[in-house]
Amino acid sequence: MPLERADFVGAIWLTTPILVLLGSKTPRHLRWILLLPFGGSCLLVAFAFPFGPDVAKNYTFGTVFYVALVNFNLLVLEDPYLEHKWTQPTSDGKEHQQPFHSLGAWDRIRWCFDNALSTRGIGWNWRTAPLPSAPAPGTSKTAFLRLSMQRILQQYMGHDIAAGILLWLTHDGKMGVLELDFVPRCIATACWWASSIAVMDIGYHFACMIGVSSGLFWTRIEEVHPVNGPWAECYTLSRFWNRTWHQNFRRGLQIPSRVVARRVVRAPRGSMLSRQTQSYFAFTLSGLYHWAAAKMAAPSESFTRTLTFFLLMPNILLLEDLVIRFAQEKLGWRGSWWRVVGLVWTFLALTILSTGFVNDLVAPGLVTAFPALRMSPTYYMLNTMVENRG
């Protein structure tokens, strides 16, 4: 079979640790030069190899935009060899930080690969915030493998229910999400979010089981955090993005957003201005590379709803912050009962606002979030119920 662009995605991701390793031997003011061969290689792949017939596979090539962003962050915006340190727990419960220049040659290579491919900063001093709870310290390998299998089964059940409902509502994918009436449209949109995140968590936990059981990677069980947090934490949109939705691509957006907030806007750290600046910039960047990736995979589609969703979201988050602050300071709403209202708000806001974005992914077949296996108990049960009624 002839090679196509998506076949080079893995190689493109490997450029990050290689460039970080080369950057350790390069003066900081010259590291940007390393981006030139990276850009040239990406252009060569784009012009020399065509897209294949699988639209979903073609969409994965769009991650080249994220890789380019991460490479720019590590080589230009940051000095990882001074700012990033491995963390190692000590016997007294504290953390020992290992700088890059204190390591031997082999450990420096491991450091570069670990840093480049660690999207959430687990085991590093720059860990992204806040991650779902990991197994307790002292958990044995056997107990961890058992917990992981339970997690995988739970996630698959959630995935099958959500994916089966989504497939059934869209009539085997023949109907777009936007073509549905309001209530089924909201349900279908929520099912897409739940189905897609569950698949990510399942794949991640299989990788964790391999790493822990073999002893090759991710061997510190107490740092093997799940990908997605509990849905009960979604009583605000902000908590949905910060705690429940996957954090795998947060790093690439967080670094330039902080640079803009602190160096350009000069907002005080932790202030409302800093938070909103980072929110607006991160969602804008995310929207642009989601749109560009989708446009490359399906050039005939406009994907304007994708851009609209990402540009609208920070405004809604700002409005949410202001309303919560007013309710707490002026109305004294601090009880736990208001979380029920918050869960309803998050469900309605997310499903209504993201319907166009989800339709942009489902209709062309970019990310359908349909059942991972051919046999879906949920889909079979729904079809059987309809046939029995008929």
Swiss-Prot record:
InterPro entries referenced in this protein's UniProt entry, alphabetically: Wax_synthase, Wax_synthase_dom
This protein's GO CC annotations: membrane
Positions of glycan attachment: 58, 242
Membrane-topology annotation of the record: Multi-pass membrane protein
Molecular-function GO terms, alphabetical: O-acyltransferase activity
UniProt subcellular location: Membrane
Main localisation: membrane
Segments crossing the lipid bilayer: 6-26, 32-52, 61-81, 307-327, 343-363
One Pfam family of this chain: MBOAT_2
Top-level taxon of the source organism: Eukaryota
GO biological process terms, semicolon-separated: lipid metabolic process
Knockout-associated phenotype: Leads to complete loss of fusaproliferin production and accumulates terpestacin.
Pathway: Secondary metabolite biosynthesis; terpenoid biosynthesis
UniProt keyword terms in alphabetical order: Acyltransferase, Glycoprotein, Membrane, Transferase, Transmembrane, Transmembrane helix
Biotech uses: Fusaproliferin shows cytotoxicity against pancreatic cancer cell lines and provides a new chemical scaffold that can be further developed to obtain more potent synthetic agents against pancreatic cancer. Fusaproliferin and its analogs show also anti-inflammatory activity and can be hit compounds for the treatment of inflammation-associated diseases.
UniProt-listed Enzyme Commission number(s): 2.3.1.-
Function: Acetyltransferase; part of the gene cluster that mediates the biosynthesis of the mycotoxin fusaproliferin (FUP) that belongs to the class of bicyclic sesterterpenoids. The FUP biosynthetic pathway starts with the enzyme encoded by FUP1 that combines a C-terminal prenyltransferase domain responsible for the synthesis of geranylgeranyl diphosphate with the N-terminal terpene cyclase domain, to yield preterpestacin I.
Family: Belongs to the wax synthase family.
Name of this protein: Acetyltransferase FUP5
Gene (UniProt): FUP5
